[in-house]
Amino acid sequence: MGRYSYTKALELLTEWANNEGYDDITFDHNDISYIDWVKKSLNIPKKIRIEGKYPVEIKVYILLHELGHHQLRKNWDSFTKKLPITAHAEHVHFFKNDTKYKRRVMYTVSCMEEEFKAWEEGYKLGEELGIRINLDKWNTFKSKCLISYMRYYGSKR
């Protein structure tokens, strides 16, 4: 068995994301990684930005996480059942320009739930596509990201 190519894994994930509707994906973003949807939409694919500072293997893990968000949101009815507080707050914010729900502790906790679930969905997608995931590196990076989300959401209180 030869060396595993995370570059090829990134290409495979990019192709998968393109097929899902993301036609603007970059891997050299100079700010935090994120996924974005079409304006005034909460789940129609638009673009994905991955931080450029990481090695290719970690970029694969970040892209899996961002695509985990896609997996959660692509069926909005299902997303609403899994994360009703986030779905309601974002719907009211984006469609009625009302931010009161986004200021609530329940929303903050629900956002954290989505982050955890996005990592789970990303891992499942990686397994489905046959992407090799080093569990030590995956869990270390995931933990680093989750603690940073906790600090971010905690600072908004």
Give short role names for the model-derived ranges.
Residues 73-114, 139:
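Post-HEXXH active-site segment of zinc metalloproteases
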